[in-house]
Amino acid sequence: MILAHDLIEKILARATNLDECIVIIKDQTQANLRWANSTLTTNGVIQERNVTVLAFISAGGKMAAGGVTRTNVDASDIDDLVNEATAAAKAAGPADDYAPIAKDWQHGSWDGAHKPTDSSIFKTFAPELGDLLKRSIAEQIELFGYAEHTHATTWLGSKGGLRLRDDSPNGRVEMTAKSHQRSRSTWEGVETHDFSNVSVSKIESAIKQRLNWQANKIDIPAGRYDTIFPSGSVADIYTYMLWVSSARDAYEGQSVFSKKGGGTRVGEKLSNQALNLYS
């Protein structure tokens, strides 16, 4: 496989008919473990590459732009990529909101290769997970979940001198537990960059504590009640709010942010409580 930065340079060298060309390559590897009914089910490593070519053509003081994205690109695909991006730009026509494109900016280790993640990231976690699964069977607790670690490296290069690189390692563990003939259930999750902060014993303690809490049941009549949300649930609700806050969906009357009679609820006061949300 051609190194990402070399492939970008080759594509840019072929984009002689374009006023500007931006190439973005993302190399990503992921290692994962999955389990169900307290038994490890699958594990493996996934590797992928995405190549995006953006073509820019000057037209009447404005700029037309178009792009294409492909996977597993090699040298023989370069001309087709450039031609397809060029055709997309011509079909799109000049953009009214065109702004000058940044030039001559470098960031990150441009020539360095992607450093793939692999199953060794679980060298401490996996044995501890195995012990937990054995204990859960003895205690009649069913565990379901997965652990994954992803390392994505993104390169962006342009004819105008942009040479940018970003490395983003991230991972997570998510585990669901069921007990007492599945009459009780709970969930625990951990975010991580390298699994050094993941403690299986802490996950186990949190799960058992929440399952034990569910032994105490209080019947509450139907009605309206004041509720205090823990911070984790607020984050989950906010994430979903972001997913459904598309301006177009709101304008077309397809979401909770749509105003009765048409338009959106932008500017409307949603709560009497002062609250700042950041993404």
Model-derived segments and their meaning:
Residues K26, L54-S58, T176-H180:
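A generic structural motif
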Residues A147-S279:
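Active-site-adjacent "lid" and substrate-binding segments of diverse enzymatic cores
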Residues M1-D19, S119-S136, M241-E268:
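N-terminal short leaders/motifs
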Residues A31-K90:
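N-terminal alpha-helical targeting/anchoring segments
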Residues M1-T41, V45-L54:
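N-terminal basic/disordered segments at the start of proteins
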Residues A4-I8, L18-A31, S76-D166, N197-A235:
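Acidic low-complexity segments
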